[in-house]
Amino acid sequence: MSDSDPKPTAAKGAAPTSIPNSTRNPNPTPPNPNPNPNPISTPAPTPTATPSPPIASSSNNGNNSTRSTNIDTNNNTNNAFFQAQQRIAARREAREAAAAARQATQQSASRLRARIAASQSPLLRRLGTSTLSLWDTLTSREGTRPAFRVGQVDAELLDEELVELLRGQVREALRYVGGGGGGGGGGGGGGVGSGVAQDWEAEISLALRAVLFKLTVWDHDATYGAALQNLKYTDARRDGPALAPPSRWQKALYGLVTVGGRYLWAKWEDWLLEQDDGFEGPSPRVKRLARWTSALSTLHASAALVSFLVFLLHGRYRTLLDRLLRMRLAPPTSQVSREVSFEYLNRQLVWHAFTEFLLFVLPLVGINRWRRWLARTWRRTKKIMTADADGGAGDKKGEYSFLPERTCAICYRDQNSASSETELLAAASGGVVGSAQTDITNPYEAIPCGCTYCFVCLATRIEREEGEGWPCLRCGELIKECKPWNGDVLEEPQVKSSPATTKTVVFADDVKAPSDHEEEENEEEEEQQGELGENEGESSQVLVEADPDGGLNDLRPETPSVSSDQADDSRGSESEDYEAEEDGLDEDPES
């Protein structure tokens, strides 16, 4: 090749040829840090002739690993960036679609508004415009943006609770004033709210509401409940950057309706109730007034419901009166952040969960058994300490060992619960007299001590211990069983004293007509009975004491009545026996 031939290389000063991006390597290989100085490729020497040094080999391996790590890192970064770009593009497309849909909706709404505006009816135009405005408000992203609806409702509830609290305190203060109760009390008698508090209940409510209105709304443009919620009454008729307080006539009308209006309405309803006494029906005029009153109450309730629903939507006027007077509750400053503390709520939830846990666990644990075990351990420890102090001597005695046998110790403890050991010792030293309330009923004997209790008392205590034993109140033994009492009631025999006066038995016929001969026989018979009583020491006959003053007229026969013939025969035989005895007595002194 001659020197004049053009060379394939680029001319001096010419621009370098640009390589397209598609042909470029996205991951260019870094230059070799140890380039071969000889560009001519030569065969590799054999290991035996020229062995490679080990240091150079490790350096090449480290470079290769670093190169592969860099390549992986670059690939991961490129993939993450590509995914982020895809997400951004998807969001942009969704936003554009939503904007297009919103624009289409606005166009349709504008066409609907144009049709409504072109309508010839003013009522239809007004209703259509209001409906479309309400729909736009509900479907917009901002919504109605109410000013603390919950806070306004809570403020009203707090105000009512405050009035009820003050009314209850006034009732308690006037509870014992004018206890007679008056005629208009309605028969309350003696309880809370009777007397003056019940007769003047409407006036008391009027005074309380008037005082609260003066100290809250009239002076500070906010009730106590609204102040706790950081709210104040404002005049909604005035537009401006700053909130304007309500005017004096607005507050005056508000107080006149809330205080005086409630009082007058309550008195009006009471008067209507008084006209119906229950015996005779009310007059036609009163019936007509009652119907009008009921209709007015229904109308007011319906209007209040509609107003409250609108309040839930917009959050401007809490009550119907606020809407009529154009007074609304609003925070005084917009810079104050509404901070809600959940400390009380969290504490309440924790205690509620803890109580539920205890109610679930205690029946499984058996708290009564543990309590009985601790009480038994304490009694044993106390008994051991007492025995050591006394030197280990003495019999087993319970805390009610001083009671008589006929007294149930369980009934006595239930009715005379002693608060200390000193009272028990005083009762033991002073003596206890049983009563019908503490006497044993249906006696049962405890096993093994044998102490006697009422069946119901003893069986209840044993069953309550669930087989672990119940300590006897008389001796301290552990009782697990009981049985019916096998004892008897013993009565001491009463010794009859000898009669101090003379007694005799007569028949009814003899009492009616006594003769002289019979009187002599009776005297002789009395003498003989007196001698026999002195010799034998007791009489074997049933005698009736004779009345020395009244004779035998007051006597009553104790023998069965007999006929007159039997009476004559018996009287004759008795007279013969007496004569024989007299003859024998007369012959004895002579012999």
Curated annotation (Swiss-Prot):
Residues engaged in binding Zn(2+) 2: C449, C451, C472, C475
- Pathway membership of this protein? Protein modification; protein ubiquitination
According to its UniProt entry, one GO biological process term is: protein import into peroxisome matrix, receptor recycling
Q: Which cellular components does GO assign to this protein?
A: peroxisomal membrane
Q: Does the keyword Metal-binding apply?
A: yes
Q: Which GO terms describe its molecular function?
A: transferase activity; zinc ion binding
Write out the residues that bind Zn(2+) 1: C408, C411, C454, C457
What's the catalysed reaction?
A: [E2 ubiquitin-conjugating enzyme]-S-ubiquitinyl-L-cysteine + [acceptor protein]-L-cysteine = [E2 ubiquitin-conjugating enzyme]-L-cysteine + [acceptor protein]-S-ubiquitinyl-L-cysteine
UniProt region (Disordered), positions on chain: 1-78, 512-591
EC annotation? 2.3.2.36
Has the keyword Transferase been applied to this entry? Answer: yes
RING-type zinc finger locations on the chain: 408-475
Q: What is this protein called?
A: Peroxisome assembly protein 2
